[in-house]
Amino acid sequence: MSNPSDGSTDPKTTFMIEEIQELLPHRYPFLLVDRIIDYKESERAVGIKNVTMNEEFFQGHFPGRPLMPGVLIVEAMAQVGGIVLAQLPDIPSGKLFVFTGIDKVRIRRSVVPGDQLVITAEFLSLKRKRFAMMSTKAEVDGKLACSGELMFAMVD
């Protein structure tokens, strides 16, 4: 993929929110990736999610002690994985991979307002050009918050 924003033919390594919205179908309040800060085609993406007190889920999780729900951390990891899968070279443009399963997921620390999640998704495998597996992790200040293997399936 070329980088049309600067006229170069170097591979694109970062994505702003508008570009993420071209690759993922998610929208507010469920788009949980603010930016991709490192990308290597067919291998990995590193994204960030700035966690603010304005997130809707903090209204009920938990009043007086806001914690980002673990399932939403996992969803953010899946969305970063979706950036990699949406651009696999052997997959027709416009195909959608959906999150279908999790293995070995562990939540290791709380994520609170003011944290910045740094999410890494590494491509592991693609079977029958339809089923994919990613290794993912989310860190805050260099400390592991969550990790696991995520499965995806392409839908028609």
Curated annotation (Swiss-Prot):
It holds the Pfam family FabA. It is found in: Cytoplasm. One of its GO terms (molecular function) is (3R)-hydroxyacyl-[acyl-carrier-protein] dehydratase activity. Keywords: Cytoplasm, Lipid A biosynthesis, Lipid biosynthesis, Lipid metabolism, Lyase. It catalyses: a (3R)-hydroxyacyl-[ACP] = a (2E)-enoyl-[ACP] + H2O. InterPro entries: FabA_FabZ (IPR013114), FabZ (IPR010084), HotDog_dom_sf (IPR029069). This is 3-hydroxyacyl-[acyl-carrier-protein] dehydratase FabZ.
